[in-house]
Amino acid sequence: ILKYNKQNDIKILDYGSGYQPRVVFIVYEILVKKYRKKVSFDCYDFYSNNDIKNLNKQKKNKIKFYHLDTIKKIKKRKYNFCLINDVIHHIGIEKENFIINILNDLTRVSEIVFIKDHFQQGFISNNIIRFMDFLGNYFNDVNTPDNYYDKKTFKNLLGKMRVIVLEKILSIKLYPPFLLFMSNPDFNFVYLIKKRK
């Protein structure tokens, strides 16, 4: 975020924030406390009105929560960044046109979209990631998909959009070694994209 934005005020959209938006809270705390930035987050998910009310109590005016459908009402670019963290595979990678429409909406309202998701390399790695996903979402009402992207299918997806890839990291170490096969950094990737003019 700091690499691509030198402004003091930063507006961030988080797509698919979930009910325990830890990533949002961590990013907010780092940018505000360590880097002294003025940060506002708008978090979107399939929240009920009651969920929105309860979540909005947590951080007062700095982090706001909204129902996903309201993104369509945003008419012009409003955000410096969009985070879409471990969300796309839950939509279902076979729903390619739907995912393209979502990413087009996000690149329309955000200068830069930060995508973090999972890569599989075959049957075994796909099922390891499914197991990890099941454990990670056990207490949430989130489906575990059957399939995850591989490098080729994700590259093909982006190739069908009018976007520029600013940066990509195809292997990220996120988990400690004692998790053995689940700590494989090749299971996680990041892409930063922006709309091509």
PLM regions with names:
Residues 108-113:
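Short glycine-dipeptide loop
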Residues 83:
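A conserved beta-strand element that flanks and buttresses the S-adenosyl-L-methionine
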Residues 86-90:
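Short catalytic micro-motifs in class I SAM-dependent methyltransferases
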Residues 79:
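Alpha/beta-hydrolase fold active-site loops
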Residues 91-105:
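A short, conserved alpha-helix within the catalytic core of class I
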Residues 1-5, 9-62, 67-73, 97, ...:
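Class I (Rossmann-like) S-adenosyl-L-methionine-dependent methyltransferase catalytic domain
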Residues 105-106, 157:
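Alpha-helical scaffold elements within enzyme catalytic domains, especially in hydrolases
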